């Protein structure tokens, strides 16, 4: 393509990224964690998925199994937490709602990142406004964020990295307009750290002599496209200041929804597997109703540990007569599918369900052979159950078949309370009456 057609972008795209998000969520409600090394673990308390800066400084890598750092944990008194996804999801919603007050154009990119269009601002105004965003998010939610601003999404990612890694920028960095200054910055960014460059592509690029972002920017498109396709070409142009990735202000409808968990301990009985599959199906149905979607088919899968002998895995996909998001209908089909693929004599490590063929609940296709099908009563029941669980906490009302004790359930030995979503776990602030009187006295 003629380069004259590729115009430099004059947009001002800000990437707001929450700093050490999972750890920051824990610190909001437990200030004693400030300044201490903290790690958050993956499902079943297996591996490190989030680290405080203090933990990073100790050399603990992302994804390291917890058993490999037991000595370091004891030696440095590292605080260990299980993943509290309900808390993190709620805090994420609060951060994103705060960002929406600063711009009508916000793309929620992930649980802890968002792109915001600030193109109506320029120069010092941008720095001041970004600093205001940063201060307000922290005041309203307690979550520290970094802000990187640039003409394209990819350069905004680079700018955010600089804002986060260099304290002198006070959490805000504006990509310079001078191409020479941009190139100087890009020369210090490893190709491994560029947004959209995975392990395989980075390995190939390094073998080709492309080790940093500047070298990638200067690589001809004809060399990139055969290996990395149109995605690689867009990335290349974004590094050159040509905006190829628009903000996605409306999330794309999901094509599938999966709920699966590894078990705390191996499960060998059909009864316990039914409890797990029923639990996962219930959660998946809740997600569908929240997304206002219905599933046309459901896939059930089970598997044993890959690291043990006698490995077994199986799955089955069953269609629904009419696309549905109603828990009883989905449970019936899921249990039938499980019974068809279950095999005695195995110790299963994981089970899950995948809702497929998702479609909007208001335009789902009917079934010519089910003219008497009427889901009105079930829909009202689901709506009532959802409202009760939303008000009083998840699983206030649940299906008896999902079990009570659930010895197979996910290991979460260091789980923090549901501070923001469960009435019984809301933190209590204690203050003496004398302190109140002293405060009144100060006012007058």
What are these regions (language model features)?
Residues 34-36, 76, 143, 294-296, ...:
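A generic structural signal for short beta-strands and their flanking turns/coil linkers
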Residues 6, 193, 201-347, 431, ...:
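DNA-contacting surface of Y-family translesion DNA polymerases
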Residues 1-237, 246-247, 286, 375-444:
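Gly/Gly-Pro- and Ser/Thr-rich, intrinsically disordered tail segments characteristic of DNA damage-repair
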Residues 115-119, 315-321, 365-370:
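Short, hydrophobic beta-strand segments
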Residues 155, 308-309, 360-362, 405-407:
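Flexible loop/turn segments at secondary-structure boundaries
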Residues 122-126, 308, 359-366:
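Short, charged/polar, Gly/Pro-enriched secondary-structure boundary elements
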Residues 109-113, 150-153, 293-297, 346-350:
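Short Gly/Ser/Thr- and Asp/Glu-enriched loop/turn motifs at secondary-structure junctions
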Residues 335-391, 395:
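C-terminal hydrophobic structural anchor segments
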């Amino acid at each position: 393509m003629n380069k004259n057609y590729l115009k430099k972008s004059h947009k001002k795209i800000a990437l707001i990224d929450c700093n050490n998000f999972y750890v920051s969520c824990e610190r909001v409600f437990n200030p004693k964690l400030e300044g201490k090394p903290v790690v958050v673990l993956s499902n079943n308390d297996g591996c490190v998925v989030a680290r405080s800066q203090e933990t990073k400084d100790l050399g603990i890598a992302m994804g390291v199994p917890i058993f490999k750092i037991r000595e370091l944990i004891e030696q440095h008194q590292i605080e260990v937490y299980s993943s509290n996804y309900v808390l993190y999801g709620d805090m994420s919603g609060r951060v994103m709602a705060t960002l929406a007050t600063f711009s009508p154009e916000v793309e929620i990119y992930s649980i802890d990142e968002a792109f915001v269009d600030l193109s109506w601002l320029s120069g010092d105004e941008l720095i001041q406004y970004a600093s205001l965003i940063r201060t307000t998010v922290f005041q309203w939610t307690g979550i520290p964020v970094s802000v990187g601003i640039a003409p394209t999404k990819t350069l905004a990612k680079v700018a955010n990295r600089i804002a986060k890694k260099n304290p002198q920028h006070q959490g805000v960095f504006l990509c310079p307009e001078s191409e020479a200054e941009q190139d100087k910055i890009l020369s210090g960014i490893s190709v491994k750290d560029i947004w959209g460059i995975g392990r395989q592509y980075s390995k190939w690029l390094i073998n080709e002599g492309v080790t940093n972002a500047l070298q990638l920017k200067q690589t001809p498109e004809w060399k990139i496209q055969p290996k990395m396709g149109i995605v690689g070409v867009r990335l290349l142009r974004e590094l050159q200041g040509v905006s190829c990735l628009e903000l996605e202000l409306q999330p794309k409808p999901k094509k599938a929804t999966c709920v699966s968990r590894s078990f705390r301990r191996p499960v060998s009985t059909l009864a316990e597997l039914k409890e797990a599959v029923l639990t996962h199906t219930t959660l998946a149905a809740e997600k569908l109703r929240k997304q206002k979607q219905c599933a046309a088919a459901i896939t059930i899968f089970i598997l044993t540990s890959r690291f043990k002998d006698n490995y077994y895995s199986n799955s089955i996909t069953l269609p629904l007569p009419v696309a549905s998001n109603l828990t009883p209908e989905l449970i019936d089909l899921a249990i039938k599918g499980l019974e068809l693929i279950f095999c005695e004599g195995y110790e299963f490590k994981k089970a899950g369900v995948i809702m497929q063929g998702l479609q909007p609940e208001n335009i789902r296709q009917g079934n010519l052979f089910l003219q008497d099908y009427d889901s009105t009563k079930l829909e009202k029941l689901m709506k009532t159950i959802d409202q009760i669980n939303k008000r009083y906490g998840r699983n206030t009302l649940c299906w008896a078949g999902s079990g009570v004790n659930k010895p197979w359930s996910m290991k979460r030995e260091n789980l923090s309370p549901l501070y923001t979503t469960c009435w019984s776990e809301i933190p209590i602030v204690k203050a003496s009456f004398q302190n109140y009187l002293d405060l009144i006295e100060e006012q007058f």
